[in-house]
Amino acid sequence: MPILRTELLPGYPIFQVQHPAVTARIALHGAHLMEWTPVGQAAALYLSPQAVYEPGKAIRGGVPVCWPWFGPNTGDPSLPMHGFVRNRFWKPGDFSETETGVRLQFLLTDDAETRRLWPHAFQLELVMELGASLHMALKMTNSGEVPFTITGALHTYLWIGDIHQATVTGLDGISYLDTVGTPSQQVQAGDIDFDREVDRIYTTSHSITIVDAGLARNITISGSGSGSAVVWNPWIEKSKILADLPDGDYHRFICVETTNARWDSITLAAGESHVLATEIKITVPS
């Protein structure tokens, strides 16, 4: 099995994947995919060189799992940004290998600490299939006796050559909420080019593509179980106030996230489940 458990730091376990088709690293803290690099490709995910690896601290970059809320908690902004599951150690489940890649399963259930933050019983299963493409599926189950409503995201930081040579396609004509400054409802006209901070929630279940001229490749993100998608880049000023992000690294990534955000919230009755999933493929234009 090409999966090795080791420690990034004492008490901070990670899994390293060395497979003929792919290399990857996953932190047990947050079940956080830190690296996914298909053979023959540059790294597909951006990971901040200033990321903090401490229990209770979210990792900047890779694919954070945001749940059971996305963004600030609307009822209590003092609660952790983007929920709490990215800040907790998950349990490893079943791992397997095929000729084309590996499959890893991670599990998390409620406990006294999570119920202090959010008073509901739940079970989460995150499955990663890593190879030439990436597939991640977050299955959420209400294991309690009362309904609950969640928002969430698979917050993918995608590595690019240069923000000035990258565009995002597939959203022309789609309505979105622009959350930079005073929130406003807009409609996308053409592709997205980057010359300022972008933080938008799109009403879409379409595939979205990053056209990256800098690395001469396209990255296509396809979501399921989702009716919304977020496109984010912090740009210059916000990067300066994010302590775990180098000031100039805004030009190295674009976040295109499969989400259940804002109006796309999910309500689960007792015993019900929902799966939020994303698939990412890299192609080289001819």
Task: Label each residue range with its predicted role.
Residues L124, L134-M136, H274:
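Hydrophobic core residues within well-ordered beta-strands of beta-rich domains
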Residues P147-T149, A153-V230:
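Active-site/ligand-binding surface loops and adjacent short beta/alpha elements
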Residues I26, L138-G144, I282:
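Asparagine-centered strand-capping/turn motif at beta-strand->loop junctions
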Residues L4-R5, L79-G131:
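Extended, loop-rich substrate-binding clefts of extracytoplasmic carbohydrate-active enzymes
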Residues L45-N87, I210, S222-L245:
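Hot-dog-fold acyl-thioester-processing enzymes
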Residues E54-P55, G93, E125-V127, W263-L268:
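Beta-strand-rich interaction surfaces with strong enrichment in secreted/lumenal proteins
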Residues R88, D193-A270:
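Acidic/His-leaning functional-site neighborhoods
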Residues M1-R60, H206-G227, A270-S286:
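Beta-strand-rich N-terminal accessory domains
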